[in-house]
Amino acid sequence: MVSLRLPLILLSLLAISFSCSAAPPPVYDTEGHELSADGSYYVLPASPGHGGGLTMAPRVLPCPLLVAQETDERRKGFPVRFTPWGGAAAPEDRTIRVSTDVRIRFNAATICVQSTEWHVGDEPLTGARRVVTGPLIGPSPSGRENAFRVEKYGGGYKLVSCRDSCQDLGVSRDGARAWLGASQPPHVVVFKKARPSPPE
């Protein structure tokens, strides 16, 4: 009886060890804490002198709003929230992990009175793939317009859109604005925890 239990115990320990080591590493904020689906974070450039945080701005029409970068590096933009995409993680695991599909939304209200969840769409004027907030218009066959990943990159992280195939998200200038979309080089970022506003 004892001789049968030992291999079973060893096999169980091996399975637990394998499942623990198989999880991708967590994404960390600027204070060294793991990103959580319960938290809000500013998405800021990893290096100073490269503009401010991510915000929402109109492109041609007042709505929908596109994801843009603040030109003034003192402006942090709006905080975002990450949630696992399509049940990618166990419900009890609230940690945001590298190379794992997530949904991203701004934790802010807009004049458009619609969702602030991100998705990638083709801009009608230029055909460029931009990150847009709000409802999906003309979803692709894959249904993954709102699937993103955070990948370790250089001294920070990069955001990746995994709509059809995974593409880096970069910032491209168009007039006075810098827009987030599928472009090179990738926009290298860090995540700063947003603190709740003190009561007035």
UniProtKB/Swiss-Prot annotation:
InterPro entries named among the record's database cross-references: Kunitz_inhibitor_STI-like_sf (IPR011065), Prot_inh_Kunz-lg (IPR002160)
Site feature Reactive bond, where: A88, A89
Single GO molecular function: serine-type endopeptidase inhibitor activity
Signal peptide positions (record): 1-22
Gene3D superfamilies assigned to the protein according to its UniProt record, in alphabetical order: 2.80.10.50
Function: This protein inhibits independently subtilisin and T.castaneum alpha-amylase but not barley alpha-amylase.
PANTHER family: KUNITZ TRYPSIN INHIBITOR 2 (PTHR33107), KUNITZ TRYPSIN INHIBITOR 5 (PTHR33107:SF5)
CDD domains linked to this entry: beta-trefoil_STI_ASI
Family the entry assigns: Belongs to the protease inhibitor I3 (leguminous Kunitz-type inhibitor) family.
Pfam families: Kunitz_legume
Keywords in alphabetical order: Alpha-amylase inhibitor, Disulfide bond, Protease inhibitor, Serine protease inhibitor, Signal
SS bond partners: C63-C112, C162-C166
Protein source organism: Oryza sativa subsp. japonica
Name of protein: Alpha-amylase/subtilisin inhibitor
